[in-house]
Regions:
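N-terminal export and membrane-targeting signals
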Residues: 1-21, 30-32
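Serine-dependent carboxylesterase/thioesterase catalytic core
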Residues: 100-182, 195
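Hydrophobic alpha-helical membrane segments, chiefly transmembrane helices and signal peptide h-regions
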Residues: 22-29, 124, 129-130, 213, ...
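Short amphipathic
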Residues: 185-186
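A generic structural signal for short, non-catalytic loop/turn and secondary-structure boundary residues
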Residues: 31, 77, 180-181
Length: 224
């Protein structure tokens, strides 16, 4: 079934409650997550846009385990991380645009400060919309999507080593990342996840992406 905007928001609220409960149960693990830092010139800066209401340094469902998996997959590289500064909220109508602007500003500023640094962009759920917009793929009309307000400059596209997307809402519209970044993108949509699959009917599938982070890290490592 295809969700209306209202139904989709109710779904995400239910998922948010589940995510918070998982965060409480797995609090010890979340506390061990890497501290977010992008101040120094690491070889690779991992920029993460978390999901709606997702707790954790980078996000307990995807961001934190993804950063750890990337560290394991890139033992010869130094890595830093940056959590996109945005509400990740259903009650804020410009949440995605705020994240879109912050992600682009961060990459632009960081690239100027660290000329040899490369970037891996990670987006989960609403955060995937943030990443989509930032590379010029509009999430407007998708669940918790919005219009593009900023894009990564074309002069920096070669610095984007990989894009890792999880539960990307534009996929429920039949859209995907195409063009310049297509070959550098690994886009995971769990079977029956209603956020990214128009006929999906398993809300818990949207919480399953921690199991894909090792494969995503291998994909990204081959492109750094």
């Amino acid at each position: 079934m295809i969700f209306s905007s209202y139904q989709g928001r109710r779904l995400l609220r239910a998922l948010a409650v589940s995510t918070v409960l998982i965060g409480g149960i797995g609090g010890a693990t979340a506390a061990m997550a890497p501290a977010a830092s992008a101040a120094t010139c690491s070889d690779v800066d991992v920029v993460v846009a978390r999901g709606t209401f997702e707790p954790g340094t980078l996000g307990i469902i995807v961001g934190d385990p993804q950063f750890s998996a990337l560290q394991s997959a890139l033992p010869g590289k130094t890595l830093s991380s940056y959590p996109v500064n945005y509400p990740a909220d259903l009650g804020e109508p410009t949440s995605v645009q705020t994240g879109n602007r912050d992600l682009v500003n961060h990459v632009t500023t960081q690239a100027a400060a660290c000329p040899s640094q490369r970037f891996i962009l990670v987006g989960y759920s609403q955060g995937a919309n943030v990443v989509d917009n930032s590379i010029g793929i509009s999430s407007d009309g998708a669940l918790v999507g919005g219009a593009i307000v900023a894009t990564i400059p074309t002069s920096l596209t070669s610095r984007i080593a990989a894009i890792l997307q999880f539960g990307n809402p534009i996929r429920a519209q039949g859209k995907s990342i195409t063009g310049t970044f297509q070959a550098r993108t690994d886009d995971f949509c769990a079977d029956q996840d209603p956020v990214c699959q128009a006929n999906g009917n398993n809300v818990l599938a949207h919480l399953s992406y921690g199991g894909n982070t090792a494969a995503a890290a291998t994909f990204a490592a081959a492109r750094v």
